[in-house]
């Protein structure tokens, strides 16, 4: 039987001692609440459903997320780490003051709906700015994995993962942003005028090769084989290493970058390097601020850097490369992922059918 005792401060403490379970207790303001808790907890023990929730009730989400970043995110690929940190900051801003046990499926569902509706994200005029479904989906994926790790590895007593019980937004259709000839000319003119030539090399290499920004900026000199005109990528988004062939333009750009007289050879082997950090180490060149400035000047605020990869792959298809050849260059893991480019194949077929008609 549970023991209910009155404490010197006037509250009521329920203590449960049961064979096969650790002694557990909880303090309440009212005796009735202590009795109700003791009765339901003992019932859970009898039915084999008892979960000790004390840690889940004490651990704040902000502390849990900090621990996740230290113990879990740190072991993920740099590309993933880069994406998770801002998502973690967003989740902490919303759930940070909650205990893990206080985050329910209803609360997570409201977060999902508010993010999709742009409730907490306004433009200069105060109008809601809805987020893309895939952005919210990735935030929920991080939130859900934190709860999974907390339950399975940290021993946090939670009955269920609140994210598993809600609907996730679908990724939606992939972006289909292409550069017009006028846009490309305007963009490249501004890129070429920028003070740091590394921005020019990075942007033009992206258009020529279809490489991701993280793949380009993390390159080391020994990964660039200009004699064979290839770049060897060891760490990619889909974990599969690949060798990227270089066009003549891409080779010339890499030659300039590798021969950069400002690159401190003794300090870094990075092709695209930033200023030394507080620890004296040089990390990959962070061009995000410069890229945003250039886009604004060019009047192309809707252009994402990743759209340059889409542009490059589209050009590969238009040039007549097979899906297998395109996949080898771009690193798309399956042919299914290249289906968004099938309309380009269809346009080629129309031209071929026209030529066939002219010949008959």
Language model features: what each stretch is:
Residues 6-110, 114, 265-267:
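N-terminal DNA-binding module of tyrosine recombinases/phage integrases
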Residues 10, 121-133, 137-142, 152, ...:
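Basic, Lys/Arg- and aromatic-enriched nucleic-acid-binding interface segment
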Residues 12-17, 231-233, 244-246:
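Short beta-strand motif preference
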Residues 24-27, 176, 230, 241-245:
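Well-ordered beta-strand positions in beta-sheet-rich domains
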Residues 38, 42, 85-92, 140-151, ...:
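Short, amphipathic alpha-helical segments that act as regulatory/interfacial helices
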Residues 134, 152, 204, 208-215, ...:
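C-terminal catalytic core of tyrosine-transesterase DNA break-rejoin enzymes
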Residues 178, 235-239, 323, 330-355:
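Catalytic-site neighborhood detector that most strongly recognizes the C-terminal catalytic loop/helix
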Residues 182, 228, 247-301:
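Active-site/catalytic core of tyrosine-dependent DNA strand-transfer enzymes
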């Amino acid at each position: 039987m549970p023991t209910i005792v009155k404490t010197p401060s006037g509250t009521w403490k329920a203590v449960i001692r049961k064979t096969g379970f650790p002694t557990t207790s909880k303090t309440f303001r009212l005796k009735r609440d202590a009795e109700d808790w003791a009765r339901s907890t003992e019932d859970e023990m009898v039915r084999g459903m008892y979960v000790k929730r004390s840690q889940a009730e004490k651990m704040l989400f902000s502390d849990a997320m900090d621990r996740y970043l230290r113990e879990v995110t740190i072991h993920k690929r740099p590309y993933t780490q880069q994406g998770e940190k801002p998502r973690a900051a967003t989740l902490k801003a919303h759930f940070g003051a909650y205990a893990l046990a206080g985050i329910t499926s209803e609360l997570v569902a409201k977060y999902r709906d508010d993010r999709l509706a742009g409730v907490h994200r306004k433009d200069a005029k105060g109008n809601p700015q809805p987020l893309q479904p895939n952005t919210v989906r990735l935030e929920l994926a991080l939130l859900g994995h934190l709860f999974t790790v907390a339950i399975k590895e940290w021993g946090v007593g939670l009955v269920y993962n609140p994210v598993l019980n809600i609907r996730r937004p679908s990724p939606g259709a992939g972006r289909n942003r292409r550069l017009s000839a006028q846009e490309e000319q305007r963009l490249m003119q501004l890129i070429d005028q920028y003070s740091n030539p590394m921005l020019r090399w990075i942007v033009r290499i992206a258009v020529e090769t279809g490489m991701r920004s993280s793949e380009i900026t993390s390159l080391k000199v020994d990964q660039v084989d200009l004699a064979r005109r290839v770049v060897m990528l060891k760490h990619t988004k889909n974990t599969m290493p690949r060798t990227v062939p270089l066009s003549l333009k891409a080779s010339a750009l890499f030659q300039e970058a590798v021969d950069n007289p400002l690159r401190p050879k003794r300090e870094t082997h990075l092709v695209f390097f930033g200023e030394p950090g507080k620890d004296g180490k040089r990390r990959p060149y962070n061009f995000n601020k410069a890229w945003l400035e250039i886009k604004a000047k060019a009047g192309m605020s809707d252009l994402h850097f990743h759209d340059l990869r889409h542009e490059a792959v589209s050009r590969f298809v238009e040039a007549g490369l097979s899906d297998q050849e395109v996949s080898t260059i771009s690193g798309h893991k399956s042919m299914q992922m290249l289906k968004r480019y099938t309309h380009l194949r269809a346009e080629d077929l129309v031209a071929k059918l026209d030529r066939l008609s002219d010949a008959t």
